[in-house]
Amino acid sequence: MPYSTVLDVLAAEYGRPADEVFAHIDPKPLGSASLAQVHRATLKTGEDVAIKVQRPGVRETMAQDVSIMRSIAKAATKVIRTSQIVDLKGVVEELWDTFESETDFLIEARNLAEFKRFAARFKYMDCPTVYAELCTEHVVVME
């Protein structure tokens, strides 16, 4: 995803330009995958962070794909008696439910924070601190 798109997503999520929240964002991503891209950044307060930014339109694209899969599953269950082997409609719905939760970065932020609390009991475990006030449905900010 182009850096300009990252800045557009951040501005849309925060309701202000990214440079009002971050002192610096490295334009080169640390990593990139099908759902999101991660960039190294520095907050205005000086902390080094990682910003995970969801690709625009990823939910809409998946919704179209799932709609097609629903139609195929419906047709397949009429032609092939697969209900004795696997519930195709159920599999498609489970896929969609999982995808929806994975694309809500507020859920991811809460899970990270919960794991950090859990891991605090163990000296050999650690988890990045989440900056909850900077997390949205499409952005996660962590140390």
List each language-model region with its residue ranges:
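Broad phosphate/nucleotide-binding scaffolds in NTP-utilizing and phosphate-metabolizing enzymes
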Residues: 1-143
